[in-house]
Amino acid sequence: FDPNNNFFTRLLSVKYDLVIDPVSPDYVFYSCFSFNIYKYPNAVKIYFTGENDVPDFNLADYALGFHYIDFGDRYLRFPLYLLDHYSWNDLDTLSSKSASSDLVNRKFCNFVYSNKKNADPIRDKFFFELSKYKKVDSGGRLYNNIGGPVKDKCAFLRDYKFTIAFENSSVNGYTTEKVVEPMLVNSIPIYWGNRKRF
């Protein structure tokens, strides 16, 4: 994490003159991996997570996250995929995309994951069961069967009819880039995760 160059500094610097003060900040953005918020007792603390965890409003003044919770003006549902490299226009076009005839000429299915840490076992089970039917190309570090991890995930997904797009867990609201990326390149996601509309 670069405190001088990140999504929040880029967004806020459009309207405000930012001063990054590591000693006495007015505002502190932190996450589940941050343990230094207690160093700033007078700062307004804003929690942001890309993980499946709920903000603790005993510690956070404000929060952004995945979950569908109502905490007045102190919480905004802001899924992590909104920070990824897509433009807002890309996301707006998702609802109007449909399967195209070029799917017929594509490879069968892919699976791109780096590890199985904190992942529900259903993801691995699905990969192995589907692989019994037909080879599923694994382009990540986990179960790689194509000669090494892919460098450009979206370019890789584009060559497939289907993408296994399983979240690490199934919780209402928890939606990551895993379902968005295949849709952007017109690969059909086989999705497991958030049961609500994302």
Give residue spans per PLM region.
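Nucleotide-sugar donor-binding catalytic core of glycosyltransferases
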Residues: 1-198
